[in-house]
Amino acid sequence: MFLKFLEKIGRKKVVLDRGPSHPKYHEAKPWMNRYYVLLRHRPKWFPFNILIHEMLADDHGDGVHNHTFPYITIILRGGYWETLSTGKFWRPPGYIGFRSANNLHRVDLKPGTKPLTLFISGPFGLRKGPRSEYGIDFKSKKN
């Protein structure tokens, strides 16, 4: 019911699995429903935001990604597999993850599930490395 309310007041965004600059953007499909609990358009100077993510598909391709900010994620429903440099881990409902902006990771879903997470993003500009990497060998990389 809360998500329907957020959608009704314009706080829902369907995020595609690739952006307009991707060479195969014409093949893009919905990857996540993002609900803005706090700010729909957060200014870069504002220190945090609160969102709800309803995941619809695995992370795109074979690579890993990071974020432009540190964040906290709390799994509310479902769960997912998260690949980090230290291995692949099942994240069940109730899991709380604290991540730096430079933490490379990948999220994969159990077939037929739509995990729901509370996502609290921290301040922008704290990432030191590139946004994402493909075909990464975690044995030679450090987070």
Description of each model-found segment:
Residues 49-67, 101-102:
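Conserved short histidine dyad/triad with adjacent acidic residue
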